[in-house]
Swiss-Prot record:
PROSITE patterns: GLY_RADICAL_1, GLY_RADICAL_2. PANTHER family: FORMATE ACETYLTRANSFERASE, FORMATE ACETYLTRANSFERASE 1. It comes from the Bacteria. Keywords: Organic radical. GO terms for cellular component: cytosol. The modification Glycine radical is found at residue 103. It comes from Actinobacillus pleuropneumoniae serotype 5b (strain L20). Residues 5-128 form the Glycine radical domain. One of its GO terms (molecular function) is formate C-acetyltransferase activity. Acts as a radical domain for damaged PFL and possibly other radical proteins. This is Autonomous glycyl radical cofactor. Signal peptide: none annotated. It holds the Pfam family Gly_radical.
C-alpha cells in the first residue's frame, strides 16, 4: 500500500517539510516536493535513505491503473465473395461499394487490382 507523508523532523534539513509517497512493499520513497536541489520531483529512493525521520500522514487518493497491452482489432465486411469478384469484373455496377480496410472505409473500385485481390484473399478464408 502506498502512504503519503510530510516529513516533519529529520537531521537532513533538505527533507524537513518535504512530501513523499512511501511504498513499503517495494521499499521505495518517491519525492513529491522538496526544498533545495538535493531531491527532485519524482525521484525514487530506498526508504532507508531517508534515515531517521518523523512524519505526518497525508491523505492520498490512488486511482487504479489500467494497462492495455496489445489488443485485438476486427474489421467486418458483410458481403459475399461473389459480390467482390463481380465488382472486379464489372466495376461500373458497383460505384458505391464500400469496404473496411485496416479501420478505414474505402471504395472497393478505388483500390488497385492487386489490392482488390488481396482483400478478397484475406477476407474469405476456409477456416480461422
Amino acid at each position: 500500500m502506498i502512504k503519503g507523508v510530510q516529513i516533519t523532523e529529520s537531521s537532513n534539513s533538505n527533507l524537513v517539510n518535504s512530501f513523499w509517497l512511501l511504498d513499503e512493499e517495494k521499499n521505495e520513497a518517491r519525492c513529491i516536493a522538496a526544498k533545495g536541489d538535493v531531491y527532485k520531483e519524482d525521484q525514487v529512493i530506498a526508504i532507508s535513505e531517508l534515515g531517521q525521520i518523523a512524519y505526518r500522514e497525508v491523505p492520498v487518493n490512488v486511482a487504479p491503473t489500467i494497462k492495455v497491452e496489445g489488443g485485438q482489432h476486427l474489421n467486418v465486411n458483410v458481403l459475399r465473395r461473389e459480390t467482390l469478384e463481380d465488382a472486379v469484373k464489372n466495376p461500373e455496377k458497383y460505384p458505391q461499394l464500400t469496404i473496411r480496410v485496416s479501420g478505414y472505409a474505402v471504395r472497393f473500385n478505388s483500390l488497385t487490382p492487386e489490392q482488390q485481390r488481396d482483400v478478397i484473399t484475406r477476407t474469405f478464408t476456409e477456416s480461422l
